[in-house]
Regions:
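Enzymes that bind and transform nitrogen-containing heteroaromatic metabolites
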Residues: 2-162
Length: 162
């Protein structure tokens, strides 16, 4: 059975993006993302893949869920949610969903874990994380990252209630 872990960073108001980019640079969050996802397959949408320069992230199987035809070396393209579910069933692993908002919305109902970073900033964004009913989840781990006695971000790990 595959584990499906949604991983993202959001600001204090739930914004996750602006103009198809991450609207902040927090090196601690980037390191956290790399540590969590390296060695695991990642799933993303076409726009998120394009934001990476149409190049796969190294040391991870990169899966792009899109209805469009894209030709990218080193990437598995899946054209439907049904096809992705079949792939997950046939290839058990811990998968990390890396965005964007539409992909999070589509995969949230089958997710088993959430890895959220809350950036201690308020930005003006154009993309929010889909609404999550946290009553269905329980917090299993959290820690704050501070620099010069200032809270920079909070890392959280959630698991689905069973």
């Amino acid at each position: 059975m595959s584990e499906l872990n949604l991983i993202w960073a959001e600001d204090l108001n739930g914004w996750i993006g602006k103009d198809n980019t991450i609207p902040w640079h927090v090196s601690a969050d980037m390191k956290h993302f790399k540590t969590k996802t390296t060695g695991h397959p990642i799933i993303m949408g076409r726009k998120t893949f394009a934001s990476l320069g149409n190049k796969p992230l190294p040391k991870r199987e990169n899966i792009v869920l899109t209805s469009q035809n894209i030709d990218a070396e080193g990437v598995k393209v899946v054209h439907s949610l049904a096809a992705l579910k079949e792939y997950l069933k046939a290839n058990p692993n811990e998968y990390f969903v890396t965005g964007g908002a539409t992909i999070y919305q589509q995969l949230l109902p089958i997710a088993t874990k959430l890895t959220r970073t809350v950036i201690n900033k308020q930005i003006v964004g154009d993309t929010k994380m889909p609404t999550i009913d946290y009553d269905r989840w329980h917090l299993v781990n959290h820690n704050n990252y501070e620099k010069d006695d200032q809270l920079i971000c909070r890392f959280e790990e959630w698991e689905l209630n069973v």
